[in-house]
Curated annotation (Swiss-Prot):
<dbReference type="InterPro" id="IPR012281">
    <property type="entry name" value="Phospholipid_synth_PlsX-like"/>
</dbReference>
<dbReference type="GO" id="GO:0005737">
    <property type="term" value="C:cytoplasm"/>
</dbReference>
<dbReference type="InterPro" id="IPR003664">
    <property type="entry name" value="FA_synthesis"/>
</dbReference>
<keyword id="KW-0443">Lipid metabolism</keyword>
<keyword id="KW-0594">Phospholipid biosynthesis</keyword>
<comment type="similarity">
    <text>Belongs to the PlsX family.</text>
</comment>
<comment type="pathway">
    <text>Lipid metabolism; phospholipid metabolism.</text>
</comment>
<protein>
    <recommendedName>
        <fullName>Phosphate acyltransferase</fullName>
        <ecNumber>2.3.1.274</ecNumber>
    </recommendedName>
</protein>
<dbReference type="GO" id="GO:0008654">
    <property type="term" value="P:phospholipid biosynthetic process"/>
</dbReference>
<keyword id="KW-0963">Cytoplasm</keyword>
<dbReference type="Pfam" id="PF02504">
    <property type="entry name" value="FA_synthesis"/>
</dbReference>
<dbReference type="GO" id="GO:0006633">
    <property type="term" value="P:fatty acid biosynthetic process"/>
</dbReference>
<comment type="function">
    <text>Catalyzes the reversible formation of acyl-phosphate (acyl-PO(4)) from acyl-[acyl-carrier-protein] (acyl-ACP). This enzyme utilizes acyl-ACP as fatty acyl donor, but not acyl-CoA.</text>
</comment>
<dbReference type="GO" id="GO:0043811">
    <property type="term" value="F:phosphate:acyl-[acyl carrier protein] acyltransferase activity"/>
</dbReference>
<keyword id="KW-0808">Transferase</keyword>
<keyword id="KW-1208">Phospholipid metabolism</keyword>
<comment type="subunit">
    <text>Homodimer. Probably interacts with PlsY.</text>
</comment>
Amino acid sequence: MTNLTLALDAMGGDFGPRITVPASLQALRLNPLLKIVLVGDKTQIDEYIASAEPAIKRRIEIKHTTEVVAMSDRPVHALRNRKQSSMRLAIELVRDGKAQACLSAGNTGALMAMSKVLLKTLPGIDRPALVSCLPAVNNTPVYLLDLGANISCDSETLFQFAVMGSVLCETVDKTVSPKVALLNVGIEEIKGNDQVQQAGQLLQQIPQINYTGFIEGDEIYSGNVDVIVCDGFVGNITLKTSEGIARLLIHQLKKSLSDGFFVKILAKIIAPRIRSLLNQMNPDHYNGASLIGLRGIVVKSHGCADEAAFLQAITLAVTEAQRRLPQMIEDRLESILLDINS
């Protein structure tokens, strides 16, 4: 394992340095080969690193700027007018080869726009996709993409997403020949719109991708597939609905376990199992969405992430950098395109 540098937008998200900096310190303690460049207001950042151990401080660099991309900024406005923002400067560090990955909890649209313009897409990729993992019944994650980077997609774009999702699953989770499916309104070949049907036909012609066909929404968490592909409109609604249901279940479970004396006693006895279950259901446990298809690594954290959730996103960015995800995607796509054209 070699040293690597992470560029971190310290000002992004709902809480800024109050969450991003302590999480960074935790990551540095866990990984002695990691260096982090904190991009943002030095005065605010210094407040949270003042008490850190000297050995940790030596692996922190601060790139000062007071400009921030607001959550209300439109992507085009941010791209044109936030050229000294903490988000943009963090991405530029990746572009210039001074960092191997970038992480931000800021404005998603602005992050996608800046990343695409500054880092460019890989050869053979038309659009980057936002991807994250969801829990499944067999305790293995299922990757869902796109989560909102592309509201509408043609069949070729969905095909490219399937290739990238497959490589991501292979690279991060070491899954051999991951099963890939297209999210649809039915499993029959006649179901769905033209884009989904045509994407399915394209994938059937590619033996390097383990395409299993269509999958319906009620099978997302079944564990029967490893990668699920859809356009960003469907994916974003699916993700947000899933997070809402998970929080509802956690709330209801906690409420049920606090009703009545004997129930409370039972809850204390089985507390470790309950905590494990709640952790598996908690959306924060899966924090971190990757913007894949770019020439560099960009990870998006939830804006409302707490310290533990933000640490999870840092871990994801580090893992993708260690395993050279963009290069893996480029190599696999080149191999597939060569086979198609031969």
